[in-house]
């Protein structure tokens, strides 16, 4: 059972009565065949549900209205099987508030060269029916995605599936509640922002809860529940001698388990799926939540440190998008550099809170060590290295008049040396196109020091995210050149200024 089981995507066929009952019967038959095949063979993340043909303005408007009010409907996939005059779609599209994808396909893959006649031509008109639909979308400034390809093509399946993930994620985001335990780290700028504007734009709400409210729940956790969770730790991780039974840090592990159980109970009771903490506001907690946060992220919660609610929300959104995909997604911070000509590297980490979903396959190490920040007892944490391969780091920032999403494509590499004195999980990567270009572009665009790191998602996913939410995206990859990047930022300033 995943979040995608809670949603469905409606498959809508556009046509008209001009072609007669027999043509419409064949259109319906084709649509049923295509939907059944896609549900069976395409490995889509959620189910396609075929709706009645849209052959008149009233029918189309009714479908769009029903989609808006059906909580299970994540979006619409539209196929213009025949020509469907686009003025029929205006009223429906004008009220539609769910994501929209045009599947530009046709029932047959190859032309029947020897038998093709005008009946065939009239039945299979995607080539120009799709263009008519595209015009009205452009005329109405309607955000919608387009996938072109035969319905049996695996590349088309992959792209439809990726769009479905965006559609479901958008619906989940409209219900997302972000809990901030305490406020921002004092005097930090980028983690702050306009929470009202964020709720208007994305749909998620952000509210603060006193740490004392959390402490009450934490203190109510029973020893029996703690013992059961400790047993899970024992089977899942490699415990250092200090954290094992009779070890001098065993009580710190028990306290970490108490905090984890309390945090999870608090989040579940409040319906929260993302949260923040800050080391400057820990009154009543015996240690900074480290292990607890790591494990909650692995369970799908969004998180960011120092009150950074934008990154916490983005992490939850990206975890929903990547559900079931290979690779993990985590809170991350660009921490320190390795400057070496031709081999510049970034070491990413945080004080404690890196998600084990990005870890290498062997068991993480559970340890308790001193943390000089926060003034509390030594916290428990999981220590691991990260899987290698292509990845992205993404940052969502508030520019006052709009949101900007920054994405840097990176290549995660194996740590060339052991890190015996580094007591935190970490990731090592090469930034594309190179560290000087990537860091300078990131800084010029205002990117945060906190990011969401993902092996599971790629640049195309984040482009779709930006498009579906109508926000600016700034991309740093192997094609980036600083003069052109600076120009793009200037052009975006003008473009989004005109849109206000």
From Swiss-Prot:
List the EC numbers from the record. Answer: 5.3.1.4
The record's annotation in CDD domains points to:
L-arabinose_isomerase
Q: In which pathway does it act?
A: Carbohydrate degradation; L-arabinose degradation via L-ribulose; D-xylulose 5-phosphate from L-arabinose (bacterial route): step 1/3
Q: Name one GO molecular function term.
A: manganese ion binding
One of this protein's Pfam families, by short name?
Answer: AraA_central
Q: Keyword annotations for this protein?
A: Arabinose catabolism, Carbohydrate metabolism, Isomerase, Manganese, Metal-binding
Would you tell me the protein name for this molecule?
L-arabinose isomerase
Source organism per entry reads: Salmonella enteritidis PT4 (strain P125109)
């Amino acid at each position: 059972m995943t979040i995608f089981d809670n949603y469905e995507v409606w498959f809508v066929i556009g046509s008209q009565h001009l072609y007669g009952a027999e043509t419409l019967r064949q259109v319906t038959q084709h649509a049923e065949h295509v939907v059944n095949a896609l549900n069976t063979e395409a490995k889509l993340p959620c189910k396609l549900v075929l709706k009645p043909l849209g052959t008149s303005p009233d029918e189309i408007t009714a479908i769009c209205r029903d989609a808006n009010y059906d909580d299970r409907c994540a979006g619409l996939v539209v196929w213009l099987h025949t020509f469907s005059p686009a003025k029929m779609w205006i009223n429906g599209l004008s009220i539609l508030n769910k994501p929209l994808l045009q599947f530009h396909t046709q029932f047959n893959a190859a032309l029947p060269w020897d038998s093709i006649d005008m009946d065939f031509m009239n039945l299979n008109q995607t080539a120009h029916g799709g263009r008519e639909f595209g015009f009205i979308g452009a005329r109405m400034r309607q955000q919608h995605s387009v996938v072109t390809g035969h319905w049996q093509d695996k590349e088309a399946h992959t792209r439809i599936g990726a769009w479905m993930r965006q559609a479901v994620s958008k619906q989940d985001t409209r219900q997302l509640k972000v809990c901030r335990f305490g406020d921002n780290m004092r005097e930090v700028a980028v983690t702050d922002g306009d929470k009202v504007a964020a709720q208007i734009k994305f749909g998620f709400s952000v509210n603060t809860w006193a740490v004392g409210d959390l402490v009450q729940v934490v203190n109510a956790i029973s020893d029996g529940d703690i013992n059961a969770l400790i047993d899970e730790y024992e089977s899942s991780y490699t415990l250092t001698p200090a954290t094992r039974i009779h070890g001098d840090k065993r009580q710190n592990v028990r306290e970490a388990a108490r905090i984890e159980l309390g945090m999870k109970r608090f989040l579940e009771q409040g319906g929260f799926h993302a949260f923040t903490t800050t080391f400057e506001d820990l009154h009543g907690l015996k240690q900074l939540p480290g292990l607890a946060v790591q494990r909650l992220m692995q369970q799908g919660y969004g998180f960011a440190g120092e009150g950074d609610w934008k990154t916490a929300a983005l992490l939850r959104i990206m975890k929903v998008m990547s559900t079931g995909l290979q690779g993990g997604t985590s809170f991350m911070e660009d921490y320190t550099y390795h400057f070496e000509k031709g081999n510049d590297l970034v070491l990413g980490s945080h004080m404690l809170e890196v998600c084990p979903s990005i870890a290498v396959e062997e068991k993480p190490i559970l340890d308790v060590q001193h943390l000089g920040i926060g003034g509390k007892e030594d916290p428990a944490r999981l220590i691991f290295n990260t899987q290698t391969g292509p990845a992205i780091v993404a940052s969502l920032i508030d520019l006052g008049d709009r949101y900007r999403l920054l994405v840097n494509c990176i290549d995660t590499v194996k740590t060339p040396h052991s890190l015996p004195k580094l007591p935190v999980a970490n990731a090592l990567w090469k930034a594309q196109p190179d560290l000087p270009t990537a860091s300078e572009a990131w800084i010029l665009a205002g990117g945060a020091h906190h990011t969401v790191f993902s092996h599971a998602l790629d640049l195309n996913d984040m482009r779709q995210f930006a498009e579906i939410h109508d926000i600016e995206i700034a991309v740093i990859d192997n094609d980036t050149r600083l003069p052109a990047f600076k120009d793009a930022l200037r052009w975006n300033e003008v473009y989004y200024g005109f849109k206000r």
